[in-house]
Amino acid sequence: MIKKTLKINGVERILILDKDETLVQVLRDHLLLTGCKIGCGEGHCGACNVIMNGKVTRSCIYKMSRVPDHAEITTIEGVGTLSDMHPIQVAWMAYGCAQCGFCSPGFIISAKVLLDNNPSPTREEVRDWFNKQRNLCRCTGYKPLIDATMAAAAVMRGEMTKEDLVFKQTGDSIVGTNYIRPSAAQKVTGTWDFGADDALKMPSGTLRLALTQAKVSHANILNIDTVEAESMPGVVRVITAKDIKAAGGTNKINGLVMLPKHNKTDGFERPVLCDEKIFQFGDAIAIVAADTEEHARAAAEAVKVEIEELPAYMNAMDAIAPDAAEIHPGIPNAFFETNCIKGPDFDWDSIPDSQQVEIESYCSRQPHLHLEPDCGYGYIDEDGMITVHSKSIGIHLHMPMIADGIGVPMENLRIVQNHAGGTFGYKFSPTNEALIGAAVKILERPVSLVFNQFQNITYTGKRSPAFMNIKLAADENGKLLALWGNNYVDHGPYSEFGDLLTMRLSQFTGAGYGINSIRNKSTTVFTNHAWGSAFRAYGSPQSYMGSEIAIDVLAAKMGIDPFDIREMNCYKESEGSTIPTGYPPEVYCEEELFKTARPLYEAAKKRVAEKNAASDGKIKYGIGVSLGVYGCGLDGVDTSNAFAELNPDGTVTMYAAWEDHGQGADMGVLVSSHETLRQAGIRPEQIKLVMNDTKTCPNAGPAGGSRSQVMSGNACRLAAENLVAAMKKEDGTFRTYDEMVAEGLATKYEGNWVTTFCADHPIDQDTAQGDPFATYMYTIFLPEVAVNTETGKVKVEKFTCVADVGTIMNRLLVEGNFYGGLVQGIGLALTEDFEDLNHDTSLKNCGILYPNDAPDDIELHFNETYRPSGPYGAAGCGEAPLDAPHPAILNAIYNATGARITRVPARPEKVLAALKELEK
């Protein structure tokens, strides 16, 4: 042990500690300064940044033996407080930088050191500084962070005040404004606790959990020996599948088959704890409960698992090979099939080869790369309910998925969403919920389970890769006539939502264009790679890797400008254009979208031409185009509920299970309810939020597929309308709480929104024809790239995006979602993948983008076509920026070099290979 005297946030502290502890452990575990986060644990992400003796220090890799005695350390808690914020913190709120908020403390720390030493940095210097400090953000795309730092610098130079930065409400409506999300202040001051922070603050007697996990991808389990582990220091119990079954559980996750007609599985392939087979690397085999996390992890490694290793099928094509064994005996590896059959058959021999193309494409196993590792905790609440806190974005959805598996009746199960440090969809699937719930039931003690980043990357779900074979045909003028496709989706070893995902290929391949004949077959395949989970834009990135590259190839073959061919074929009411599933879109807005985009495209072409004219040929420049369309909601009839309650003090409490990835659910509830509540004189600050607890909030459905603004937004609107209607007197004034009670009127009202109109045209499981979504989002992507022909490195220098997501409810949120989604799309196109289990196990190795990898020049334009079924005319927005940026980037590479790449990521070696092919 060593003794250290440190000045932390201005206070002298005497600490007795282990010399091998890291600084972040001391700050968090000893002092509960949880504004300092643990993301990667390897010094790659900057979430743990603190200031030590005036320098930025990555505290997760800084051993206490290296910390000088009497060092002065500042954490985010010492930068500013809720009542006295630093200008950087105010700017972070004003520019919408705190989306999930997990990275905010580390960035603010870095920005403070920069501005303390360089009060007038350029934008390039700010980006370089953040890059040097290894600051990562997965939500914002970095541009708002640079904007905020520049604004804070102006305040610190005395050129403006903090008050100048803050949004000032001028009318009684906040729709379409930059109103700051309610959680922003806590996020920028380090007081917004995430799951691992909560876990540190649980009561004494809380047991810490660790998992024994598979180290191979496919094997039979012959024996599990827990004897040695059970005798290790601090261990209370080792739980295996037999314990779950003894406690009344089936030990199976319910994968919720959504489209049963052509599904060859019942959805129960995934065990809570593996006892017979291992299906993927990282599968959980045992849960160790101990007094400390260190003891639990040591014992988890001591559990002996005897296996018979089996051939591992790591992609769909290997898994459907004739000699491939069934991963789940009795169920074919190709377990689901859907066909999009629209319009009449097309005679492909009726048109010349010059008017048709065929391509093969591959969309990769993109990892979510959220900075906060998966985490959660559980306990038995005051009513005896098994309570699980996690990052779930489907708290009501996950209850039926895990209840029988752990032997807990639904009515005795409660799920609460933690403040989540980003999910981007992976938490649509349960990850730790059943493990925590089973441990609480068996141990009857509070527990916590916190993954490290290695576990987070290797065990949680990924975007399902898709191999696509697409044909497109057009008439002599470029008018699209037909689309044919044959596609395979690699969904990993578990079926959950695989059918729904694969149906998306029917719904989005060729979307945006009035194609009268479509024959598009898609097959879902079990493999032994990471299980497929939802990822932002769910199903559409795979679809557009096929159709948006195919239309570009067709345009080039026919000598038509790629923008022109898309504009020519976009949905037009005058032509009666229909979506791939056979029905008209809810609004015809694409023509106006292309009109808005046309001058931006022409300007981009001019810039690119000028750069190429000035280049020596080593760097080649190009402009790409793509069109993306995404439907908001779950297929068919969808529903959401919310409560609005008038309180004695005249405030209103909104109860909503609108789960938050970081996209801004708190702001969504606030603006969707306030727009109605303002009629009764309720101000935004008078609206209280109770969110994301199955015990207190009605079922609103999961936060996925950009459904929340439409579904939950409407539910909040209706709840507010019902409350306001009850408050309203005949003379037009409004009752107080006391008057409501005196008149015997209820003070709490429910809002229920149901897309009953979708029941009129349900999806036909044989043809995929139907009208499944309440509303759609439309986006044109225009990236400008620079390709280094000697190294193969591609840089997106500017990204212009033109979108229509209906009424913009909060501009900060919508713009922030687009900035972040576009940069995730750049990662998908150029760098990100999870394929090699010996390499792709860290944020850095998976290809996450740092600030200098993303463009600083991102230009957003929005048309706001009113959506009849959206609250106040709004659609969703979260999926839109990531549905088709990647094919646009690949199309830009072609425009620059003539090299056509149809597989992502287009890493330098792939680009170089394509360039060399041109020389043959």
Each predicted region: which residue ranges?
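Glycine-rich loop/linker segments at domain edges
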Residues: G96, T177, S183-T189, L256, ...
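Phosphate/diphosphate-binding loops
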Residues: D291, R445-V489, N714-D738
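Helix-loop-helix junctions that connect adjacent transmembrane helices in secondary transporters/permeases
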Residues: A324-I406, C570-T651, S842-H861
